Amino acid sequence: VVLSFMREGFLALNAKTGKEIFFERFRSPINASVNAASPLVIDNQVLLSSCYEVGAGFWAYKESSAGKGSFDAIWKKKNALDCHYSTPVQRDGFAYGFHGRQERGPVLRCISLKDGKVMWEAPAIGAGNLLRAKGRLIVLTEDGELIVADASPDRFRVLHRQQILGAGSRAHFALSNARLFARDQRRLVCLRLDQFE
């Protein structure tokens, strides 16, 4: 199955034939909006999140005897996790992502994938991107601040905080062999993350 989060909604195609097997409208009534966060696939389930009064939805894929398959909504909530640009990450049944519009100062949130319940919101850290590695959330804010925190549904606990870039750090960063690669509008940096374990 090929999944795509299109401007109009959630599309699933048969990988062999290219034929549509599922579509559900999942978009804002605001025409100027986009669905920018990528689908978060977890086994046979998928989490979608969008801003502009859309929210999040969690679906489960079920294979049919005819090979067509279908997606059944587990839950959909308007105010659970409204990701504007950044794709959320998951760990042990919980998703972590930036909730709210980028220009209005989103908050980092943890939600339960079981029912979309909000577990916590982090103090205002602004917009950014995040990855998950070894039970940690690795966050790079648009202001160039690196935050390493526990990926735990209990609370937001910062383990390390450091200014590594200037403002305008909107590009997604990469992690490889315990090294973080990130850039702002003027430079590229590489940091060893194993020093924060």
Segment roles from a protein language model:
Residues 1-197:
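Noncatalytic, solvent-exposed loop/strand surfaces
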